[in-house]
Amino acid sequence: MCNIIYNNVYQYNILKNIMSFVKEKNTPVMEQYLNLKAQYKDHLLFYRLGDFYELFFDDAIKAAKLLNIVLTKRGNSCGQDIPMCGVPAHSSESYLHKLIDLGFKVAICDQLETADEAKKRGYKSIVKRDVVRVVTPGTIIEDSLLEDKSNNYLASIVEQNDEYAISWLELSTGKFFHTLTSLKALDSDLLRISPRELLISEKFTEDEKIRSVLKNYKISITQHAQSFFEYSKSHRTLCEFYKIRELGSIGNFSKVEIMACGALLEYVRVTQRGSIPRLEFPKTYKQQNFMLIDASARRNLELFSTQFGEKKGSLISVIDHTVTASGGRLLKQMLASPLACSKAINLRLSTAQFFVNNHEPRRKIREILSNIPDIERSLSRLILGRGSPKDMNLLKIGLGKTLELSEFLSTLHNYCLSEKSEINSQMSFQCLTKEKEPVSTTQVISSDESELSTIHKSLGNHKDLFELLNSAILDNNLSSVKEGGFIHSKYNSELSELSYILNNSNKLVTKLRESYRDLTGIAALKILHNNILGYYVEVSANHKITSDIFIHRQSLANSMRYTTNELKELENKILTARDAAIGLEMKIFSELCSEVAKESEKIALAANALAKLDIRTAFAELAVQNNYVKPIIDDSKEFNICSGRHPVVEVNNKFIANSINLAGIHLITGPNMAGKSTFLRQNALIAVLAHMGSFVPAESAHIGVIDKIFSRVGATDNITAGYSTFMVEMIETATIVNQATDRSLVILDEIGRGTGVYDGLSIAQAVIEHIHNVNKCRAIFATHYHELTKVSKYLKNVKCFCVKIREWNGEVIFLHEVIEGIADESYGIHVAKLAGFPDSVLNRASEVFEELKA
């Protein structure tokens, strides 16, 4: 279990009394540093000095150790050496990554002018510097600090009068959500959202129940005074950010939701130091539209990671066939929040079915998608003013590929509508066959209500912007506009002239030299250069130049040196061309960013459409490769799976498929190692996949919409909360009996084994009766208590099943087949033998077993 990371754990004072050092006679640079540090005492301050970011005092001591870099010193203050360490500015992101992962906040202080500009202000003026942004775990936008296929959410939780709200946004993509919640649901919400950083009030953490929930997560916690979340302030912040008068124009908010959303925006404003990000209007997350998977079920089903914290072996590791970063992120959101609406699910399934049936369009679309960069994050950086030439180039490539994809979908649309029978060899649509499932190709492609049609429209037409960027931006991988060389020289006449000078300076000098030779008649006339005179005309002392255009510069024993106004002008152009070109490119880049900003909403819409298309084709690829089938999803209460398989276990192991027709409660008996837990989990995972809009590992599946999935499988102590294994088991079971509805799916494994036999049996039987009579939900209950099977005699919707076992020559063979009936015994001694128990212990166990049976 991971401990919570509180930022105030890392709070430290730069000096015992920082003001005493400010008053002490210091160098201008150190005085500037100390004044800035006084404003950011709780942050590491990256202070730009030339090509390095330097850290001083306690910052340096701490950073040098954590980053494994050399700790040195720079002068002294108050009679003490000043500790110092530094990192190259060009590679600072890798060091930032380490510090952010450790829970630090880093204030980035940059130079706001050049040394020459500072000199113009005065002889003793130092370069202006200021903090341009604060980097925290939840406000990262740099690609190198982010995982391509993972969201990086900043969240806030607010409570007022026992009403809770949680809001979350991602600065790197512009996504913004909010919802009402409760103390009971907080654990599930945090696990579903998985924020990197959480804003809460200092008062909020005084609640022991809140602290016990937060201890389960490795989240960077940022605490603020209650005034930071104040309602009127938050309301004003939201209205000012979105330039509206009333919040009703962008959505419905409760008072506590406004407080949560407003606090997030205020925190973004503070950390971004005036740069305005592109954020979508806050969307209400309506829980009734999604399947609720409680925190215990999320962990037990190993949706995103195994019990050991590994991604390999989780459900996401098997089903993620996406080829774009945005598709991978959206897939995780879909897995975290499966749908609970049959119409919406079936729209997704129909699109996936089309791509299952039609291989060539699927292949072509995935090929195009695989070459589309992460335009969603590049767009956000460009709008925020932190984009690079690389980002602009990636956006250009992405828009070009989006146009190609849109044209392909148009061709596909026209092809499906045409009456022609011939095969278009160029598009290779020979796989547009008659459907394996009853889904109309024409309807999926052309219907205004179809998901594919909606996706196609959302891609939009970005031809004008693409052509603009394509004419302006060279293919590049540059991380800074200050490097120059990323704008086509032909895009701008002035830049073209500067580029010509930069690339042809020798030719220009030679051309001028030849004209001077013709003018003077001196064939040996030269134009040379040195660091003192710059460019100059040189002739031997024997020659005399009479033309008025030549200005005498220097006389030597064997030569005479001159200059001309024309040569001075050329020299000035050559010397300033690079700086002028870079300045002009920066200006053009800024203009292009403005053009991108005008189209930002359309680009964001296209990026979301690309992600959806990626997932639908990925689901089809998964279905074809792993032999999945399209489930029937409706509003019934069916749960009929024919030859279902565990999607993860089957990948690397020979798997025995099992069927289930669950109308009430299935009570499953059998020994450990027989496959009960796997059977329980596989059915829950099949339900999750189906509600995502994915095909499922089975021969057939008919599932009525499930509103909630609960799981109590396995048990461990929760030491941080002070709970025993049995207490954890009881808490999880209490959640089920209190919250499950008649549309829920419950999987229960071994209730009551953490206490005495009679206690455990009594609790287990009472739970079954409650689920049957009160919750009335679909449930699979695995147990060692054979005595429980008697409930099937008086509870009409309870059926008994067992895992098939074969005994052969004194050995037990687990067949992993679930059949109707009741297990004869638990075969615990046989399992102990498989585990390697000594014969003496096994023999004694057998003796005791026979005595107990007697």
Swiss-Prot record:
One of its GO terms (biological process) is mismatch repair. Pfam families: MutS_I (PF01624), MutS_II (PF05188), MutS_III (PF05192), MutS_IV (PF05190), MutS_V (PF00488). Disulfide bonds: none annotated. ATP binds at residues 670-677. One of its GO terms (molecular function) is damaged DNA binding. It comes from the Bacteria. PROSITE patterns: DNA_MISMATCH_REPAIR_2. Keywords: ATP-binding, DNA damage, DNA repair, DNA-binding, Nucleotide-binding. PANTHER family: DNA MISMATCH REPAIR PROTEIN MSH1, MITOCHONDRIAL, DNA MISMATCH REPAIR PROTEIN MUTS FAMILY MEMBER. NCBIfam families: PRK05399.1. This protein is involved in the repair of mismatches in DNA. It is possible that it carries out the mismatch recognition step. This protein has a weak ATPase activity. Belongs to the DNA mismatch repair MutS family. This is DNA mismatch repair protein MutS. It comes from Wolbachia sp. subsp. Drosophila simulans (strain wRi).
